Amino acid sequence: MSSTVPSLDATSLETVLRNVAERYPQPLIAGQLKDIPRIAFNIRLIATRMGFDVSVCDLGGGIGLFSVGCAASGMRASLVDDFNDQVNHEFAAVPAAVHRQFAVNVVRTDVVESPPNFPADSLDVVTSFDSIEHWHNSPKALLHRALSWLRPGGLVIIGVPNCVNLRKRLTVPFGIGKWSSMSDWYEQTPFRGHVREPDVDDLKYMARDLQLQNVEIIGRNWLGYYHHSGLVRLVTRIADLPLRAFPTLCADIYLVGTKAAH
C-alpha cells in the first residue's frame, strides 16, 4: 500500500491523521480516530514553532498516532519505545504495518535503561507525551542525553497528566482519584502504570535543570474528554476553555522550550 497522503497545502492536518488512523487494525481504529484532536494539537505544537520540515524523535509513544502522524504530515520522525505494554503485545505488527509504511524510524528499546545513540546536534525536536510518568527511574539522565541530540535552538516538548488538576482537588477529599487501579498495580508484572505524575512546578524544575529557553507551560484537558464518566465529559466541555488560562488546574500539562545555544 502506498504511504502517500494528501499535501497539507490541499487538506487539513486532521484529514491526514484520519487517513493514517484508518490504516490501523480494525479494533484500534475507533480509538485512534477519537484521539485525532489531541494528536493534531501535539503536532501543531511543533509546526507552529518549527514548521513541518523538521526531524522529530518521540520517546515512549508506543503504537499511537503521534509519530506516524508527524511522518505523514511531512516531518522526519523517529519513535523510541520498548513496545512492552499489553496493547503492544496484542497488536505487535502495528509498527511495521503502519509506522514504517510512512518511513518512521522505529527504535525498539527501553528508552530509560538502554537509550538510543542519536548523533549530537542531529535532531530538531524531541518529544514525550504521557510517558515519563510511567518510568520507574528518574528521567533526568535520559532527558539530558536527549537534549544532546538536539541542535542549538531545537525544541523540547513534554506532555504529562497533572497530579493536582482541578478534578482531583475536588474528588480526592471524597476518596476518589487513585493514580492506578488495584489490578493494574497488584496483578501486572511488570507494573506499567503511573509511578509519579508531575505538576506545573515539576515541569518548571525540569526546564531549569535542562537550561531551556523560551519556556512555556500549556494546559489542556484531554483526559476529561476521554473520561468514562459522562458527567466529567460534560463538565470538561463547559470548563475546558476557561481552565486553559490556569494550567495548574488542567488535566494535561505541557512543557515547551528550546535548547540553549552552545
Residues covered by each model-derived region:
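Conserved class I S-adenosyl-L-methionine
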Residues: 53-62
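S-adenosyl-L-methionine-dependent methyltransferase catalytic module, highlighting the catalytic core
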Residues: 6-37, 41, 61, 82, ...
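Conserved SAM-binding loop of SAM-dependent methyltransferases across substrates and taxa
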Residues: 63-75
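Conserved SAM-binding motif I beta-strand of class I
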Residues: 76-82
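Glycine-rich helix-loop-beta junction characteristic of Rossmann-like nucleotide cofactor-binding loops
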Residues: 43-51
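A short acidic, Gly/Pro-enriched loop at the edge of an enzyme's catalytic core
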Residues: 116-126
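Structural signature of beta-strand start/N-cap positions in the alpha/beta core
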Residues: 55, 76, 122-124
